């Protein structure tokens, strides 16, 4: 048995968790709802205010999925109660961000602005023109959106310009040295 999978997922009264016959775990909170589809080799049972997962057989795959689904359900419970966020910083002359409706407009030194459609369930806040925060209940989707925004202009090692995660250290390289 997986060490992570053995531990039950404990949730409070503000969260409703249900298991459907199609082996899907539905986690509902005050603001949002998340669904985790599971393979048939792991089953979930609700026991009071905790979810207990058990592998149905002793194959390598079901042991691996046991821990994975437990972590996914824990992330869903945390997501619907507290939510997840990821900060991004824009470093460079003229690099700006602003949100207009469900679109994020980025000026990243290209000849055109980069327009990004904000997915459903994700909220992007622009604190300053050079820093923004991606918020949402799904840890996976928040990370995916932040990575997509970063991929428009990843930080380059010589000047450090680009979109970086908040607090990310960029490994800098020395420029050309003039030879004699």
From Swiss-Prot:
Q: Which family does it belong to?
A: Belongs to the universal ribosomal protein uL6 family.
- Source organism per UniProt: Bdellovibrio bacteriovorus (strain ATCC 15356 / DSM 50701 / NCIMB 9529 / HD100)
Q: What are the UniProt keywords, alphabetically?
A: Ribonucleoprotein, Ribosomal protein, RNA-binding, rRNA-binding
Pfam family membership, one: Ribosomal_L6
Return the protein name: Large ribosomal subunit protein uL6
Any one Gene Ontology biological process term? cytoplasmic translation
Return the GO cellular component terms, semicolon-separated. Answer: cytosolic large ribosomal subunit
What is the purpose of this protein? This protein binds to the 23S rRNA, and is important in its secondary structure. It is located near the subunit interface in the base of the L7/L12 stalk, and near the tRNA binding site of the peptidyltransferase center.
């Amino acid at each position: 048995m997986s060490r992570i999978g053995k531990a039950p997922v404990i949730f409070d009264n503000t969260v409703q968790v249900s298991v459907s016959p199609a082996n899907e775990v539905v986690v509902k909170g005050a603001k949002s709802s998340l669904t985790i589809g599971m393979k048939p080799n792991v089953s979930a049972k609700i026991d009071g205010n905790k979810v207990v997962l058990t592998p149905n057989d002793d194959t390598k795959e079901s042991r691996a999925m046991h821990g994975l689904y437990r972590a996914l359900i824990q992330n869903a419970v945390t997501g619907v109660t507290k939510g997840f966020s990821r900060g991004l910083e824009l470093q460079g002359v003229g690099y700006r961000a602003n949100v207009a409706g469900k679109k994020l407009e980025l000026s990243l030194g290209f000849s055109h602005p980069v327009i990004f459609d904000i997915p459903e369930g994700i909220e992007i806040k622009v604190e300053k023109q050079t820093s923004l925060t991606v918020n949402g209940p799904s840890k996976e989707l928040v990370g995916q959106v932040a990575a997509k925004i970063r991929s428009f202009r990843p930080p380059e090692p010589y000047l450090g310009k680009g979109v970086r995660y908040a607090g990310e250290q960029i490994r800098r390289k020395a420029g050309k040295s003039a030879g004699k």
